[in-house]
Amino acid sequence: MKDTFQRSINYMRISITDLCNLRCQYCMPEKGIYKKTHQDILTLEEIEQIVRIGAENGINKVRITGGEPLVRKGVIGLIKNISNIPGIQDIALTTNGLLIKKYGEALKDAGLKRINISIDSLRPDRYKEITRGGDLSQVLEGIQEALRLGMTPVKLNVVVIGGYNEDEIEDFANLTVDDPIDVRFIELMPIGEASGWAKDRFLSNEEVKSKIEGLVPIITDATSPARLYRLPGAKGRVGFINPISSHFCESCNRIRVTSDGKLKPCLHSNHEIDLLRVARENPEQIGAVLSNGIQLKPEKHYLYTNKHEMSARSMSEIGG
């Protein structure tokens, strides 16, 4: 499917829960979020149906997100079913890593191809602070489990926060040397909990990159948001995702579906289409709604302009 700007849209990011077993400061309020009823979120069958119809209309890549997707009961079966949908070539998962050791084998057997792990510090005390209680050792065990299972390259998503973890940039980059790990530095975005302090703590990826010596640029997939580099002799890669300082809207190939069934043509727009209602009342219209949503994708986001409306949703509600 192509949008009005002739971008090919083949990638669906679908959040299966807004619940999480962490409370990261820039993602979720300390007390958590209002717990929706089962009636208010997509069932696993509805998620599968949406992906199936998406595949019939050109979607071939799917990423399962949250919240923390591994806290949703039935996630293994969902991944297995999606991986068997004709046309789906790639299925990936974004997780905080705490439950990979527990579910890794089952995830691989279900057909999961790739895994992204969100981790913003390699220091136990600091990690516990930013996540409001997380155990770093569990995440590190999860990374090793993903490597053992061959889900490579294992991608680590690192949000760089000025005055907080910028002194760990080189430590993260060095993780790519001995293992097939891709470390991707992501600029802090003004969404939800982060909107109040994103400007004060924002660090551009040009600044981040300047702190890593010896990076060599490598060829990057044009549709990937990450600009990739490699340290000399490294098995993995270092990537930079710059949604603020150098957006990649011109090559955007994705749509998002939230756990409560809202189709979001753009992460940074408040415009949403109620796909949950369509799935329950007129499921035969799902394909048309997906197509319409794609046509409504804006040319670019308008962060930090007078056209931008700050999202009231947390990142866990939208889907990370």
From Swiss-Prot:
Show the Gene3D superfamilies listed in the entry. Answer: Aldolase class I
Gene name? moaA
Its function?
Catalyzes the cyclization of GTP to (8S)-3',8-cyclo-7,8-dihydroguanosine 5'-triphosphate.
Q: How does it assemble?
A: Monomer and homodimer.
Read off the lineage from the record: Bacteria, Bacillati, Bacillota, Clostridia, Peptostreptococcales
This entry's comment on the bound cofactor is: Binds 2 [4Fe-4S] clusters. Binds 1 [4Fe-4S] cluster coordinated with 3 cysteines and an exchangeable S-adenosyl-L-methionine and 1 [4Fe-4S] cluster coordinated with 3 cysteines and the GTP-derived substrate.
Its Gene Ontology biological processes?
Mo-molybdopterin cofactor biosynthetic process
| HAMAP family, sorted | MoaA_B
Where GTP binds, per the record, is at 13, 63, 94, 155, 254-256
Query: What does the entry list as the binding residues for [4Fe-4S] cluster 1?
Result: 20, 24, 27
User: Its pathway?
Assistant: Cofactor biosynthesis; molybdopterin biosynthesis
Q: Which reaction does it catalyse?
A: GTP + AH2 + S-adenosyl-L-methionine = (8S)-3',8-cyclo-7,8-dihydroguanosine 5'-triphosphate + 5'-deoxyadenosine + L-methionine + A + H(+)
Source organism per entry reads Alkaliphilus metalliredigens (strain QYMF)
What the record says about family reads: Belongs to the radical SAM superfamily. MoaA family.
What is the protein named? GTP 3',8-cyclase
Its keywords, alphabetically, are:
4Fe-4S, GTP-binding, Iron, Iron-sulfur, Lyase, Metal-binding, Molybdenum cofactor biosynthesis, Nucleotide-binding, S-adenosyl-L-methionine
